Curated annotation (Swiss-Prot):
GO terms for molecular function: cysteine-dependent adenosine diphosphate thiazole synthase activity; iron ion binding. It is found in: Plastid, Chloroplast. Expressed at high levels in nodules and shoot tips, and at low levels in roots, flowers, and developing fruits. In nodules, expressed in the infected cortical cells and in the pericycle of the nodule vascular bundle. This is Thiamine thiazole synthase, chloroplastic. It comes from the Eukaryota. Homooctamer. GO terms for biological process: thiamine biosynthetic process; thiazole biosynthetic process. It comes from Alnus glutinosa.
C-alpha cells in the first residue's frame, strides 16, 4: 500500500472560493545545493531559503489589499464562531481573574468553551493590584498555579508578589485564547439565563453597548447560547457584576443575594474556594460572585482565591460533563488537586 509522508490540509468548503490564505502564506521554496566532495567523502548538502529583501524604511510599502476583503475576513470568522458556539459544552460568563482560570477546562480538547465578557478588554480587576497599584499579591499555596504558567514572582514567607498584575492576566489570556477549543466573545453581555425543567441550559446574550442602551431604543432583542454547563464568574456587585446570581433571584431559583460583607482577607479567601459550587443544576458560581450569594467577606487585593476558585469551578464543570476531573480522582495531569478539593455544603454560609 502506498503512503505519503505529508499531506495538504483540506480546506473548509466555506473558504473554497476565498482568495485569502487561511492556512498561512506558503514559504518560498528552499534551494538545495550539493557541495562537490573529494573521493570517499560524504556529500555535503546545504539548504537555504530565498533571501529576505532588506527593509527600506524611507519607502516602506505593505502588500496591497482590497478594503472589502478586510470586512469579509472579520465577518466570516466571527459568524462562523457564533454558529459553532451557539450550542456548546461550557459557557463562562465573565473573563476576570477567576473566569480566565477556567482555562483548566480547555486542557481537554474535546470540551468546547465559550467565554463571554462585557468589556472590550478581558481581565476584570486583574490588570492592577489594590488602589490602582501594579503589584499582585498571591497567598501560598496558590503560587503553584503561577509556577504552572511560568510566571516569575518575588517570594516571601507566606505569599508571593508578581511585579505587575498585568503579567499574570496577559500570560493566562494568551495561553487560553491560543487553544483551538476556546472562543472569547468580548463586548458581549449575558442579559439572562436559559432555564428548562429547573436546569440552567445557557445564556441570553447581547452586545454590551446594546444592553446599556435598552432604555434609549424601542426594541433590541437578544441572542442565545445553549450550553451543558454555565460558569458564572461575574464578580461582585456593579453594573455588570453578580449578574448570574441576580438572574437566579429574579426568576425565583434562589431566594436572596445578601451581598458580600466587610473585608477580612484570611476568612474571605478560604471561604471563596470552599463555597465555589454548582449553585443550581447547570450553573456553577465562582470568584467574588460567590461572596455575593453567600454573604462572605470581601478579600481586597489578594488574588490566590480567585485562581483556585476558578480551577475548582473548571473541575466542577468537567465533573458535570462526566469527564475526568480532580474532584473524584479521575483526572490525570499536572494540577495540584489538594488546592481545589475543599467541599462545600450547599446550605453553608460564610461568617464574617
Amino acid at each position: 500500500m502506498a503512503s505519503t509522508l505529508t499531506s495538504k490540509p483540506q480546506r473548509l468548503a466555506l473558504f473554497e472560493n476565498s482568495a485569502s490564505s487561511f492556512y498561512g502564506t506558503p514559504l518560498a521554496p528552499s534551494s538545495i545545493r550539493v557541495q562537490p566532495t573529494k573521493a570517499g567523502a560524504k556529500p555535503s548538502i546545504s539548504m537555504s531559503g530565498a533571501p529576505s529583501p532588506p527593509y527600506d524604511l524611507k519607502a516602506f510599502t505593505f502588500d496591497p489589499i482590497k478594503e472589502s476583503i478586510v470586512s469579509r475576513e472579520m465577518t466570516r470568522r466571527y459568524m462562523m464562531d457564533m454558529i459553532t458556539y451557539a450550542d456548546t459544552d461550557v459557557v463562562v460568563v465573565g473573563a476576570g481573574s477567576s473566569g480566565l482560570v477556567c482555562y483548566e477546562l480547555s486542557k481537554n480538547p474535546s470540551v468546547q468553551v465559550a467565554i463571554i465578557e462585557q468589556s472590550v478588554s478581558p481581565g476584570g480587576g486583574a490588570w492592577l493590584g489594590g488602589q490602582l497599584f501594579s503589584g499582585m499579591v498571591v497567598r501560598k499555596p496558590a503560587h503553584l498555579f503561577l509556577d504552572e504558567l511560568g510566571i516569575e514572582y518575588d517570594e516571601q514567607d507566606n505569599y508571593v508578589v508578581i511585579k505587575h498584575a498585568a503579567l499574570f492576566t496577559s500570560t493566562i489570556m494568551s495561553k487560553l485564547l491560543a487553544r483551538p477549543n476556546v472562543k472569547l466573545f468580548n463586548a458581549v453581555a449575558a442579559e439572562d439565563l436559559i432555564v428548562k425543567g429547573g436546569r440552567v441550559g445557557g445564556v441570553v446574550t447581547n452586545w454590551a453597548l446594546v444592553s446599556m442602551n435598552h432604555d434609549t431604543q424601542s426594541c433590541m432583542d437578544p441572542n442565545v447560547m445553549e450550553a451543558k454547563v454555565v460558569v458564572s464568574s461575574c464578580g461582585h456587585d456593579g453594573p455588570f457584576g453578580a449578574t448570574g446570581v441576580k438572574s437566579l433571584r429574579s426568576i425565583g431559583m434562589i431566594d436572596t443575594v445578601p451581598g458580600m460583607k466587610a473585608l477580612d482577607m484570611n476568612v474571605a479567601e478560604d471561604a471563596i474556594v470552599r463555597l465555589t459550587r454548582e449553585i443550581v443544576p447547570g450553573m456553577i458560581v465562582t470568584g467574588m460572585e460567590v461572596a455575593e450569594i453567600d454573604g462572605a467577606p470581601r478579600m481586597g487585593p489578594t488574588f490566590g482565591a480567585m485562581m483556585i476558585s476558578g480551577q475548582k469551578a473548571a473541575h466542577l464543570a468537567l465533573k458535570a460533563l462526566g469527564l475526568p476531573n480532580a474532584l473524584d480522582g479521575s483526572y490525570v495531569g499536572g494540577i495540584h488537586p489538594e488546592l481545589i478539593l475543599a467541599a462545600a455544603d450547599s446550605a453553608e454560609i460564610a461568617d464574617a
